[in-house]
């Protein structure tokens, strides 16, 4: 029996892609009869400030894990201890904070610039969600490729072509409201596209920064559960995701899984799973976004996207994680 310590702290703070990764991983791991899982959580920002979380709780986590006789400790985001006598796995979803520091608050910028090299050095293995993210970790954190494990994200059962669809005529955007997600340019591109009769529906949690969305033809839906999100994908004329930087881009894969045409930035990491399926645009150019939206709406349903997305499952991702844990515990 392998005893795994799993940091689930981010679930208290986010409902975005990181939360999807943690909840999907945890659900799969709990079905593994040969694993015993010890969850760790600092309890959310109401109980500890960001500074205390990063400077007190995480440094103490390996000692707690040793007392609990944990065989492997897995920190599910880049926030992790700087040293650990327990074999340590750290998931780095992306390095946006180093590539685009202006898109983050001051504490996150300062802490990440200082902490990430230490975290990368302490980790026995670093999990990344794409080959692009692997290259970023190697370049920016000087981590050798042999300590990096690429385990792509997956899609769960709700996201499939057949099933209930949301009513209405709309373009769907799934994104946290924060500067890096590039929503103002998406909205401008939507307005320029001239898609008569369609509204833009925005799904996602509040983020940070002065991101203003709204106006005629724009409807904010906030956070929805997975079943409702799948309904929205299936009912959409197209989905659009034009973030300026991602390690993976899970909404693109989820739209594909529902056979919904999807607009996405050209290049990496999207071309690792959406090449030839997504309608590629320049996310810095509203006219390019507008053209992509028009093409996607005209293109209709995309069964090839669903077939491509079927290669990416959370079950496969979970098994890859389990294999890594066993390797480190051996």
Positions of predicted regions on the chain:
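Carbohydrate transferase catalytic cores enriched for Leloir-type hexosyltransferases
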Residues: 1-330
């Amino acid at each position: 029996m392998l005893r795994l310590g799993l940091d689930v702290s981010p679930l208290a703070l986010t409902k975005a892609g990181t939360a999807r990764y943690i909840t999907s991983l945890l659900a799969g791991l709990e079905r593994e009869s040969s694993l015993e899982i010890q969850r760790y959580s600092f309890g959310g920002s109401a109980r500890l400030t960001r500074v205390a979380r990063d400077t007190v709780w995480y440094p103490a986590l390996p000692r707690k894990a040793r007392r609990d006789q944990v065989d492997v400790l897995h920190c599910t985001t880049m926030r992790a201890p700087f040293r650990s006598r327990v074999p340590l796995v750290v998931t780095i979803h992306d390095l946006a904070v180093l590539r685009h520091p202006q898109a983050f608050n001051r504490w996150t910028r300062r802490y990440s610039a200082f902490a990430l090299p230490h975290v990368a050095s302490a980790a026995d293995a670093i999990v990344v969600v794409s080959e692009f993210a692997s290259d970023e970790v190697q370049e920016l954190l000087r981590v050798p490729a042999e300590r990096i494990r690429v385990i792509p994200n997956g899609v769960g059962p709700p996201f499939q072509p057949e099933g209930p669809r949301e009513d209405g005529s709309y373009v769907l955007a799934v994104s946290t409201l924060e500067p890096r997600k590039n929503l103002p340019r998406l909205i401008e591109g939507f307005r320029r596209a001239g898609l008569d009769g369609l509204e833009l529906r925005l799904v996602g949690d509040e983020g940070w920064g002065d991101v203003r969305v709204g106006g005629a033809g724009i409807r904010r839906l906030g956070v929805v559960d997975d079943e409702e999100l799948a309904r929205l994908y299936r009912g959409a004329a197209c989905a659009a995701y034009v973030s300026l930087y991602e390690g993976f881009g899970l909404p693109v894969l989820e739209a594909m899984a529902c056979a919904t045409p999807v607009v996405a930035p050209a290049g990496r990491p999207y071309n690792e799973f959406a090449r030839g399926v997504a309608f590629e645009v320049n996310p810095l150019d509203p006219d390019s976004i507008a053209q992509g939206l028009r093409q996607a709406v005209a293109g209709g349903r995309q069964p090839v996207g669903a077939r491509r997305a079927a290669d990416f499952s959370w079950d496969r991702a979970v098994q890859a994680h389990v294999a890594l844990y066993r390797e480190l515990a051996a």
